[in-house]
């Protein structure tokens, strides 16, 4: 899980204010840290199928949000993927 301080920092960085938590860029930016922690978990626990389901759900959610952002606001999409170092 993300700490409250880290979460607040991500929200202000991508949402432009503390209260803008529903912005697509903010929602996308909050997912990579959880995904990375789960990757490390699966290196140690290869047979944990229940957590794998949650991991796949998070990856798919990020994928759907990125596709939505790409269709609606391509400039914001480019900024987000460059800031998070995801995709090409």
Swiss-Prot record:
<dbReference type="GO" id="GO:0003735">
    <property type="term" value="F:structural constituent of ribosome"/>
</dbReference>
<comment type="function">
    <text>Forms an intersubunit bridge (bridge B4) with the 23S rRNA of the 50S subunit in the ribosome.</text>
</comment>
<dbReference type="GO" id="GO:0019843">
    <property type="term" value="F:rRNA binding"/>
</dbReference>
<keyword id="KW-0694">RNA-binding</keyword>
<comment type="function">
    <text>One of the primary rRNA binding proteins, it binds directly to 16S rRNA where it helps nucleate assembly of the platform of the 30S subunit by binding and bridging several RNA helices of the 16S rRNA.</text>
</comment>
<dbReference type="InterPro" id="IPR000589">
    <property type="entry name" value="Ribosomal_uS15"/>
</dbReference>
<dbReference type="Pfam" id="PF00312">
    <property type="entry name" value="Ribosomal_S15"/>
</dbReference>
<protein>
    <recommendedName>
        <fullName>Small ribosomal subunit protein uS15</fullName>
    </recommendedName>
</protein>
<dbReference type="InterPro" id="IPR009068">
    <property type="entry name" value="uS15_NS1_RNA-bd_sf"/>
</dbReference>
<comment type="subunit">
    <text>Part of the 30S ribosomal subunit. Forms a bridge to the 50S subunit in the 70S ribosome, contacting the 23S rRNA.</text>
</comment>
<comment type="similarity">
    <text>Belongs to the universal ribosomal protein uS15 family.</text>
</comment>
<dbReference type="GO" id="GO:0006412">
    <property type="term" value="P:translation"/>
</dbReference>
<keyword id="KW-0689">Ribosomal protein</keyword>
<dbReference type="GO" id="GO:0022627">
    <property type="term" value="C:cytosolic small ribosomal subunit"/>
</dbReference>
<keyword id="KW-0699">rRNA-binding</keyword>
<dbReference type="InterPro" id="IPR005290">
    <property type="entry name" value="Ribosomal_uS15_bac-type"/>
</dbReference>
<keyword id="KW-0687">Ribonucleoprotein</keyword>
């Amino acid at each position: 899980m993300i700490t409250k301080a880290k979460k607040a920092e991500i929200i202000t960085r991508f949402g432009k204010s503390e209260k803008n938590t529903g912005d697509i860029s903010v929602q996308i930016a909050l997912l990579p840290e959880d995904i990375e922690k789960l990757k490390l978990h699966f290196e140690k626990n290869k047979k944990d199928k229940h957590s794998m389901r949650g991991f796949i759900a998070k990856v798919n959610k990020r994928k759907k949000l990125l596709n939505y952002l790409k269709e609606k606001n391509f400039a914001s999409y480019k900024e987000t993927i460059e800031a998070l170092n995801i995709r090409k």
